[in-house]
Amino acid sequence: MFAVAVRASQIPHLTRLNRRMHASADPEKIGMTLKQLATLASLRDRGELPQQSLCDVLRTSQNTVVMWLNELEELGFISRVRDADDRRKHNVAITPAGTAALERGELEMRRLEDEVLAGLTADERAQLRKLLAKALQEPG
């Protein structure tokens, strides 16, 4: 019975697909790590954010996000400024250099995605993207 349930589940397939993408995602080719790419994409999509809000968006601890932001700031991809209303807080924004690096990284990720999903037609890839986005939506 358990073997049938495992075969019926799509989770192992999604896990294997995720591992293939990560194995193919060479930071040298992308120009940054996948974590950095996700951070920049979040800032581009949402605009300037308080650092704590970015932690919530990325579902990652404050300490980890600070480490990522330090790396991105050193690269010139983000800027941190003190919140005008609460000087203890920092807001984070993507810089023009960060936007350019993100665009290059996303282009490489699309190329990798095409390689990993080569067995699917363009319509099937579009459907997969749509279904995955729907599955990842927050409830409510």
Regions found by a protein language model. Give the residues of each.
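N-terminal leader segment of winged-helix/HTH proteins
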Residues: 1-31
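N-terminal helix-turn-helix DNA-binding core of bacterial DNA-binding proteins
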Residues: 19-64, 75
